Amino acid sequence: MSLTLEQVKRIAHLARIEISDDEALTTQGHLNGIFQLIEQMQAVDTTGIEPMAHAQDVSQRLREDAVSEGDRRAAYQAVAPEIEAGLYLVPKVIE
């Protein structure tokens, strides 16, 4: 796939980018180079290759799931305007 000069100008217009003819020609070359690279990558046979999320087989170190703060629910709800059954009540906004 390659872009024509008119297509590059149209894309620039849609993106609200002012572009001169020289800039459009340069941009056309850059974009067509990118499309050629994509075509080369798509031509590679990847049959039998398992997809991967990362280039290296590493895993994230996880910290221990431990409580670090005490339960302050009662203190927070003591200053709330209205609560019911441990839940905060708020005024109805949408009818």
UniProtKB/Swiss-Prot annotation:
Gene3D superfamilies on file: Glu-tRNAGln amidotransferase C subunit, N-terminal domain (1.10.20.60)
**Enzyme Commission identifier(s):** 6.3.5.-
Domain of life where this protein originates:
Bacteria
Which keywords annotate this record?
ATP-binding, Ligase, Nucleotide-binding, Protein biosynthesis
The record lists the catalysed reaction(s) as: L-glutamyl-tRNA(Gln) + L-glutamine + ATP + H2O = L-glutaminyl-tRNA(Gln) + L-glutamate + ADP + phosphate + H(+); L-aspartyl-tRNA(Asn) + L-glutamine + ATP + H2O = L-asparaginyl-tRNA(Asn) + L-glutamate + ADP + phosphate + 2 H(+)
- One Pfam family it belongs to: GatC
What is a GO molecular function of this protein? asparaginyl-tRNA synthase (glutamine-hydrolyzing) activity
In the record, biological process GO terms are:
glutaminyl-tRNAGln biosynthesis via transamidation; regulation of translational fidelity; translation
Described by its record, this protein's role is as follows:
Allows the formation of correctly charged Asn-tRNA(Asn) or Gln-tRNA(Gln) through the transamidation of misacylated Asp-tRNA(Asn) or Glu-tRNA(Gln) in organisms which lack either or both of asparaginyl-tRNA or glutaminyl-tRNA synthetases. The reaction takes place in the presence of glutamine and ATP through an activated phospho-Asp-tRNA(Asn) or phospho-Glu-tRNA(Gln).
Family to which this protein belongs: Belongs to the GatC family.
Subunit-level organization? Heterotrimer of A, B and C subunits.
Q: What is this protein called?
A: Aspartyl/glutamyl-tRNA(Asn/Gln) amidotransferase subunit C
Gene name for this UniProt entry: gatC
